[in-house]
């Protein structure tokens, strides 16, 4: 995974350094007796155009490998320092915002045009679209994207192999060892599911192995059909309401996220709403601390934004998102109705109205722990807030 100079201007040279390291890694592997290139694929995050891919593809071929035939003094570069391999690399676009997900077929189609590729991998983000537009919008965007990529595959005869990055939290995809089958049914055309740390480390080993086996044993199929017009109409309504409700809760989210236990360091992706996130002048944290903040006080974030949809629109969602009711009901295990009633600016009333459309299954012990988190967060003494947040995280088997 490399920086995208179109977005991360100050890290452009890191991209070039990374590309230059690929032949060096090949040399190390060759010295160890390996004949296969250890690095042959590069993921480009926040990809929004085929030109971004083409620049890297050509730079590697023309500059990194191409300099082998350049003469310096009395010899060529390759005669001087050895061969450069592999001859070319595969570029994987990571599409993360609504515009890129909706036009991924165009981005990929333009990039593969005129090239003799047997296959092309495409990486669909799941967590950051949820952070930007809401969980429902993220699911529908992914489904629409997969449908368009399948059409591109049939049109070009180039096998398109989608990757989807999902987390264990319902808000971020609900892919956990105990729910792998539902994800496979929801996204039958996906070739690769990325497994995040919660999947691997927060369940018994036997359960994790069974979940991985289920994923590996399932053959790819065709994507489930979605109506593009209905998808865009629902996303417009739900995401608009979601952003209003997030703005109303932003101060509380910030307070909680500051006490969220840090799991890893990661550079911000400048300019992407979900990374260095800004909404109506309000800055918000990344996906993990964001969702952890809301889950920890008993407010499942996948409920935000749904109040904008009518009963008929929810039925339309159910036709396209087969595990919709199950995912929402799963998330309501982590709800604290007392805390819902304490939310400002009408958000609590909106959530209560949403809950009437689903089978709500709150966990009493979890609700009590979530109430304690909010009590501490609203108090003057927050010294125990991180411990209180971790208590809820252990109960749900994921942080955020």
Predicted regions and their residues:
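Acidic, glycine-enriched catalytic cores built around paired aspartates
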Residues: 191-192, 200-400
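Catalytic or ion-translocation cores adjacent to nucleophile or general acid/base/metal-coordination motifs
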Residues: 83-87, 101-233
């Amino acid at each position: 995974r490399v920086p995208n100079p179109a977005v991360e201007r100050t890290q452009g040279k890191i991209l070039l350094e990374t590309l230059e390291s690929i032949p060096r890694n090949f040399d190390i592997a060759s010295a160890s007796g390996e004949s296969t290139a250890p690095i042959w694929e590069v993921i480009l995050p926040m990809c929004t155009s085929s030109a971004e891919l083409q620049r890297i593809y050509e730079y590697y071929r023309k500059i990194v490998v191409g300099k082998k035939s350049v003469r310096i003094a009395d010899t060529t570069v390759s005669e001087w320092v050895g061969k450069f391999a592999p001859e070319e690399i595969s570029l994987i676009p990571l599409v993360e915002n609504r515009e890129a997900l909706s036009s991924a077929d165009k981005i990929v189609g333009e990039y593969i045009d005129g090239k003799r590729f047997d296959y092309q991998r495409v990486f669909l983000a799941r967590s950051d679209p949820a952070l930007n537009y809401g969980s429902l919008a993220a699911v529908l965007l992914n489904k629409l994207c997969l449908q368009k990529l399948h059409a591109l595959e049939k049109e070009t005869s180039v096998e398109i192999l989608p990757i989807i990055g999902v987390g264990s939290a319902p808000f971020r995809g609900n892919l956990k060892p105990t729910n792998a089958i539902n994800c496979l049914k929801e996204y039958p055309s996906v070739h690769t599911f990325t497994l995040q740390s919660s999947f691997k480390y927060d369940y018994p080993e036997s359960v994790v192995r069974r979940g991985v086996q289920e994923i590996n044993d399932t053959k790819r199929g065709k994507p489930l059909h979605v109506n593009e017009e209905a998808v865009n109409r629902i996303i417009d309504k739900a995401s608009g309401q979601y952003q209003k409700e997030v703005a109303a809760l932003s101060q509380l989210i910030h307070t909680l996220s500051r006490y969220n236990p840090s799991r890893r360091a990661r550079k911000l992706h400048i300019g992407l709403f979900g990374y260095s996130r800004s909404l109506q002048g309000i800055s918000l944290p990344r996906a993990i601390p964001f969702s952890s903040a809301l889950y920890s006080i008993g407010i499942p974030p996948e409920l935000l934004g749904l109040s904008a949809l009518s009963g008929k629109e929810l039925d339309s969602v159910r036709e396209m998102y087969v595990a919709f009711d199950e995912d929402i009901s799963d998330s309501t295990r982590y709800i604290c109705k007392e805390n819902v009633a304490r939310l400002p600016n009408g958000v609590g009333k909106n959530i209560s109205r949403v809950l009437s459309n689903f089978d709500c299954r709150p966990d009493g012990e979890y609700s009590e722990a979530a109430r304690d988190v909010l009590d501490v967060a609203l108090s003057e003494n927050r010294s125990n807030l991180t411990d209180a947040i971790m208590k809820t995280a252990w109960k749900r088997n994921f942080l955020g």
